[in-house]
Amino acid sequence: MKIYLVGGAVRDSLLNLPIKDKDYLVVGATPEQMLQLGYRQVGKDFPVFLHPKNQQEYALARTERKIGLGYGGFSCHASPDVTLEQDLLRRDLTINAIAQDEKGNLYDPFNGIEDINARLLRHVSDAFVEDPLRVLRVARFAARFHALGFHIAAETLALMRQISASDELNALTAERVWQEVDKSLGGPHPEVFFEVLHQCGALEVLFPEIFALFGVPQPEKWHPEIDTGVHTLMVLAQAALLTEDKSVRFAALVHDLGKALSPKEHLPKHHGHGQKGLPLIKALCTRLRVPNETRDLALLVSDQHQNVHQAFELRAETIVKIFDKADFWRKPERLTQLILACIADMRGRTGFENNPYPQGEYLTQCFLAANNVDIAAIIAAGFQGAEIKQALNLRRIEAVSQFKQKMQTKLPTDEQ
């Protein structure tokens, strides 16, 4: 019985990155032996055990055989005669197929160390095509290690295209797809994840609403990058620079879905695209089972981002109506999220990357003015029932109007 450290821990150690989780591989043991040693079995489909003291995962060496569609369509064979190399052979990428024994010796039958040094994401074997989840995993690794200079091997990208052209991606569950998206949204370069999916053909299958944006033109005056799909990924990249909030990043990704529905005769203009995108966002979020809070922010950003961009031109009544509709009174953090997504939208354009966004501070101050209206004073003045809400609304509008008048000389555009 031999125990090896495998997978991400070995890879990240070689890259001098922090190690989050440690996974161990056990060669030459049976489930009965593991149980006798005090390990607790947790794997149903294949033998995975938790260490009796530190609760880390120890998996018995195994081989896999494809028997059906999807990432779950495998028959696993675990026995003491499965070798270290046989187990490593079933892994996705060479950089994840390196093992380290208890003395620190490295075992690298598929040249993963060489690929780490070459900054190359390369598949271990042609069995790569048997698991469609690997398309998303490789895209995520490309995004995660983008700053280190990693790129996908041409032959691996070809296999990813092969998977995308088959029916295999459709066999992935919504939960697994969203899990990979969620992990990528939390990384430093989520835009690379979607760039890779676009390159290999998976974006069209899994995210048709986003795929439809590529090739859709925008006015060159405001969008020197022209292509809406390119703009979308630039906005996502800017959102990642602005905040670690994954909901804001997702909202940035889907804020312009409605542009794909603009009539061809109206291009490159996109009137009402924010509202047109709402059903598309709802459909995407329902299909992928996106968390409700993330979905709701995405809908808010799509619906209101044009108003936020034009904040200086809005009447006080309109501003308060937006605050009401978004329920900022109870959820003031959503205003911050909305503004962050709008900053990303503004900066996600060629040549606009470092521009200021005074609309954000302006709307924040409008909200503070409106939110400072004293409800107790309204009640004390004798208002009752529905009158209270009406009086509150009027006083909030008046508060915003007074702030606007005070700011009149400082505004970049005329107030009409």
UniProtKB/Swiss-Prot annotation:
Binding site for CTP: 8, 11, 91, 137, 140
Keywords of this entry: ATP-binding, Hydrolase, Magnesium, Metal-binding, Multifunctional enzyme, Nickel, Nucleotide-binding, Nucleotidyltransferase, RNA repair, RNA-binding, Transferase, tRNA processing
Domain of life: Bacteria
Catalytic reactions of this protein: a tRNA precursor + 2 CTP + ATP = a tRNA with a 3' CCA end + 3 diphosphate; a tRNA with a 3' CCA end + 2 CTP + ATP = a tRNA with a 3' CCACCA end + 3 diphosphate
Cofactor, how bound (note): Magnesium is required for nucleotidyltransferase activity. Nickel for phosphatase activity.
Cofactor: Mg(2+); Ni(2+)
Binding, ATP: 8, 11, 91, 137, 140
EC number assigned by the record: 2.7.7.72, 3.1.3.-, 3.1.4.-
Pfam families, per database record: HD, PolyA_pol, PolyA_pol_RNAbd
Residue ranges occupied by any HD domain in the UniProt entry: 228-329
GO molecular function: ATP binding; CCA tRNA nucleotidyltransferase activity; cyclic-nucleotide phosphodiesterase activity; magnesium ion binding; phosphatase activity; tRNA binding
Residues the entry annotates as binding Mg(2+): 21, 23
Other notes: A single active site specifically recognizes both ATP and CTP and is responsible for their addition.
Protein role: Catalyzes the addition and repair of the essential 3'-terminal CCA sequence in tRNAs without using a nucleic acid template. Adds these three nucleotides in the order of C, C, and A to the tRNA nucleotide-73, using CTP and ATP as substrates and producing inorganic pyrophosphate. tRNA 3'-terminal CCA addition is required both for tRNA processing and repair. Also involved in tRNA surveillance by mediating tandem CCA addition to generate a CCACCA at the 3' terminus of unstable tRNAs. While stable tRNAs receive only 3'-terminal CCA, unstable tRNAs are marked with CCACCA and rapidly degraded.
NCBIfam families named among the record's database cross-references: PRK10885.1
Quaternary structure, from the entry: Monomer. Can also form homodimers and oligomers.
Free-text comment on this protein's domains from its UniProt entry: Comprises two domains: an N-terminal domain containing the nucleotidyltransferase activity and a C-terminal HD domain associated with both phosphodiesterase and phosphatase activities.
Name of the protein in question: Multifunctional CCA protein
Highest classification ranks of the organism: Bacteria, Pseudomonadati, Pseudomonadota, Gammaproteobacteria, Alteromonadales
Gene symbol of the encoding locus: cca
